[in-house]
């Protein structure tokens, strides 16, 4: 059983303490009602991992943990087998005591694009919405954040996060809660809020932006990364049944339209800091994610389009401030 008690104890002593009015009951309800058919298998994999304190831990340039003396072949194989029980691994990569988890996404590339444009994360309390396996939270900690809290309702991601945390010496500077943004009260408590790869999955994107704003302190910073298309401030793509084989894609605005959405929600100092086409080097099938990936979702005769005929995935990073 994954224990959230450490997180409750942590926030009881800081400015997130008012969250304890609702959070424990929500988690207790989740524990009663959840259980994906494979959840027991996943949580067992976490439980059976060895407890290791890293001799060398690098979260600034990567997510890498090393022991003082190399682990035995048997120990490495045990870790690898248990981590493979948590496949597919989508966000990473991770290098843990000789086990290199080559994930579907090179999330480090995204972090390298985002990091230069952020306000200094030193000492900050951060919320990462739709955090996946938690890769970027560890990089936030590496960049100096005091506390990174991730929310993602996907149970596999929770187990992947807890597995990595255990191999990082049970590091308590990052925590993942199996909740969606709509389940959070208006905490107004985070210095920086990240929403990366979430907005296009929301039926009401402006409501999502308001929800993000409700989590920020005054003068807090929003980091928004999402799919965009080319066009002016009035351009928005509303895909049909699927976009790049994904059913749950609702609105893909231009970067200029997205700036207007943020302005409408009351954000200021809005900047588009990066726009890039997603490549099949950044998102691809690997030994740790063996099903279809980006190359399968693009037109084989024209990779500038998806198999449905829409523009191929292009992503923008916008940064804005809550006044």
Curated annotation (Swiss-Prot):
It is an enzyme of class 2 (transferase). Its EC number is 2.5.1.-. It holds the Pfam family Methyltransf_9. It comes from the Bacteria. The gene is cmoB. Belongs to the class I-like SAM-binding methyltransferase superfamily. CmoB family. CDD domains: AdoMet_MTases (cd02440). Homotetramer. GO terms for molecular function: transferase activity, transferring alkyl or aryl (other than methyl) groups. The keyword Transferase applies. This is tRNA U34 carboxymethyltransferase. It catalyses: carboxy-S-adenosyl-L-methionine + 5-hydroxyuridine(34) in tRNA = 5-carboxymethoxyuridine(34) in tRNA + S-adenosyl-L-homocysteine + H(+). It comes from Shigella boydii serotype 18 (strain CDC 3083-94 / BS512). Transmembrane segments: none annotated. GO terms for biological process: tRNA wobble uridine modification. Keywords: Transferase, tRNA processing. InterPro entries: CmoB, Mo5U34_MeTrfas-like, SAM-dependent_MTases_sf. Catalyzes carboxymethyl transfer from carboxy-S-adenosyl-L-methionine (Cx-SAM) to 5-hydroxyuridine (ho5U) to form 5-carboxymethoxyuridine (cmo5U) at position 34 in tRNAs. Carboxy-S-adenosyl-L-methionine binds at residues 91, 105, 110, 130, 152-154, 181-182, 196, 200, 315.
